[in-house]
Amino acid sequence: TVKGGGHGDYKLIALAPASVQEMADFVALGFELAFKYRNPAIILADGVIGQMMEKVVLPAQKPRRTDAEVIEQCPWAATGKAKGRKPNIITSLELKPEAMEINNIRFQAKYKQIEENEVRFEEINCEDAEYLIVAFGSMARIGQKAMELAREKGIKVGILRPITLWPFPTKAIAAYADKVKGMLVTELNAGQMIEDVRLAVNGKVKVEHFGRLGGIVPDPDEIVTALEEKIIK
């Protein structure tokens, strides 16, 4: 449901904030990307981030496009002013299979363009890491503290935080599969992103999952223990 909101072979841009600041920033970014690619974008926030209180710096307000700018910049828009051009018909329904296939091929080309240009992720202490914690949202913040505790014990751990869950940072994770001994995917679920990580790693290193369910937020020590028991042992 993150990559695509349902059936139909389509994909959604999914942004995963890890702070209240990013919650605010990603609203503007989500609209910007949705407008740029004419593609739905979703902000995949978790309950922990949603209940946090932090200082936020809001961006300067941008002026709205004038009607003339909309017509110039958005030739696809249904503005109600079709003088001088053919009407824009906006629909996902094509009754002819041949026409529908052409549409779908065009969409797939757009998705490849998004995958090439819009992958976002954060790396923390990955330069010398022997083990990697892969996490998004609030779990990435908890994982960062777990990384610090692990390094105090002499375990070289880095964090890779996907910011876009689609497009997913597949190439970045695949590159680390040649450098680290194992990866622990930490999530507030029974295991969802781990499948994407395993596909990226392609069996090169061990990939295991640690998660808590039902709204329970784990302690950083639990992640360190999971790393030691599932990956390092």
Language-model features, listed with the residues they occupy:
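Conserved thiamine diphosphate
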Residues: T1-G47
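Short acidic, glycine/serine/threonine-rich loops at helix termini
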Residues: D25-A28, M52-P59, D196-R198, P220-E222
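Short, solvent-exposed amphipathic alpha-helical segments in soluble enzyme
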Residues: A28-L33, L58-Q61, K145-G154, A174-D178, ...
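Conformationally flexible catalytic loops at phosphate/diphosphate-handling active centers
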Residues: R38-E123
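Glycine-rich beta-alpha junction loops
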Residues: A45-M52, G137-M139, A190, G214
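Redox- and metal-dependent alpha/beta enzyme cores, enriched for Fe-S-associated oxidoreductases
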Residues: R120-K156, L160, W166-A172
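Peripheral docking tails and interdomain loops at the edges
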Residues: E187-K233
